[in-house]
């Protein structure tokens, strides 16, 4: 019994930095922009590449664990995660940091299925296994929720690379404990890896996201954007066709023909897009516009984190009493109303109103997330429960990556359209200041004080307006989705 719970402690320890790294850079965005000279586009890639790559790699890494055993996979993933953290901490350019974040994502994609497989292999009794899974889930949601606060504390007192360096001692301790105490398991050599399918999916996702970002930025010619978009769409279509044709697919695409499962996947992605995208937007506004430190920004956003953490048990009861359809659509509708309210809130003078709306957003979005889990797990056939769970995991990670991309694009587009810069700037300076808030601040710091202050004032006014546009747009999309989900789930329940 002692060895079982020691294994759980080891699993939880290694999972903590994986969960935190998904959100820890949200409050670090302004710091990275200034320190590395990252453009707005580079900043989005630094943050969202982690979730996008992890979404495509988590399933084949799970298959690799079946082949070599979860202990070896945990050792391999932990080692890669630790080395990538060390490399990321001493990045001197945005491109290098993006590359190390890719390696971090691959390491994390090994760790997540290894920890779940470890729990299944270690806890034979259902009661103990469910308890262990509950601890694992709490650590995952808690780590992601408090990532911005932890990042803020570290940035307040240490070098920005400390948000990555903190992973290294944790990994070293876990690797030592794993080697000494975790038993080795026999692998199944016949398990297919589907690495080619995973690479195809990741490239398709990255090409589609890249084409969307560059189209709205207007940095490339129309034919280059069209070619990138078409290539991504063709690769995605080829991936789907391959999954349907093979006898042992990476993703069981036939599960998407079930209306409730499809609705659950959409809800999971939407909830993650909402929470992650909002955190990134808020972190930038609080620091760039209102002058808060990273730590103060993390504290200001606590209502979202706390409310989302406490929503689980309450939302579970609500699903049982009110039904999946009402909780799911109600959660999205309340999230939309929260966005509308926050779009009209002045964060410098209406803090209590902002905190109340953020708490409502955290609770409602997390409730929709729990409803999505209930929908997927309840609708999936027993023999396909693992495949359904894998799809849900991918939806979470993909939603996190898309949340950063979507909110970043909305913010960037409205910022560029609304900024009114002072006269006397060269064309290159105008293009740079109009690109993003971070680049406007970089330019202002390089110019004489009077001219720099005029640019800062213009950028802050534009960012506040852009914040309202982005939140209102997101609220409208959520409201339309809630209406669509209401009718979709009604049709599914009548079948």
UniProtKB/Swiss-Prot annotation:
Question: Does the record carry Cell membrane as a key word?
Answer: yes
For this UniProt entry, the molecular function terms from Gene Ontology, in alphabetical order, are: transmembrane transporter activity
Pfam families according to UniProt: MFS_1 (PF07690)
Print the keywords alphabetically: Cell inner membrane, Cell membrane, Membrane, Transmembrane, Transmembrane helix, Transport
- Record PROSITE patterns: MFS
> What is its biological role?
Major efflux pump for acriflavine and other quaternary ammonium compounds (QACs). Also required for resistance to methyl viologen.
Give the UniProt family note: Belongs to the major facilitator superfamily. TCR/Tet family.
What's this protein's name?
Methyl viologen resistance protein SmvA
What is the organism field in this record?
Answer: Salmonella typhimurium (strain LT2 / SGSC1412 / ATCC 700720)
Q: What lineage, starting at the top, does this entry show?
A: Bacteria, Pseudomonadati, Pseudomonadota, Gammaproteobacteria, Enterobacterales
- What gene makes this protein? smvA
